[in-house]
Amino acid sequence: MTPPSATETAPSLQGGLKMSVTDKSGPDRVKRNELAELEIASQMGAPDVYIDAERGTEWYLWKGSIYVKPLRFENRSGLYVIVLKTDPRAELGKHRHRGEVRAYTVRGNWGYHEYEWTGKPGDYITEMPGTIHTLWMGEGSEVMFNVVGSIEFFNDDNTLRETLDSFSFWRMYVEHCQERGIKPNEKLWY
């Protein structure tokens, strides 16, 4: 896209924004830059995505009594967004994250045996890459996790048991959908 000349009107963007380009400096220049950046975002950016939590994805049993509901898979960065829930108290083995994890407590309580805090509804937690801990979830808990990269699970003797990433959680979701005779929602990849 070529920039408008000093006498042209920039194209309408983002709900009808228009501007007259008459000066190469000052407030008009800022507006021109903002409009140019909005145009770049509309042409090059990813679209907004809505996932219906009831019809756009499925809970599946993962480990023990812990269920997973996938909300997003992104193959460029390795990001995946999942919700974990359990009815009885549950634990997930000792594991290490190779990327950052962000968590939001929807309901119940949860934490890691290695830490003193307990997540409760509304709490937000950030975990740094390389941390090793053992997840516990209280009865009736539900937590949304934004995970980047892989998770390595360890045996009791600290040997590596398995490595999971976005492709692993997608595979488990697809297998669950196939067992139920439903089509996996490919729009979860964005």
Named regions from a protein language model:
Residues 83-86, 105-108, 124, 135, ...:
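Short, well-ordered beta-strand segments in beta-rich or mixed alpha/beta enzyme
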Residues 113-134:
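Short acidic-glycine-tyrosine-enriched beta hairpin
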Residues 129-157:
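Ligand-binding loop in jelly-roll beta-barrel domains
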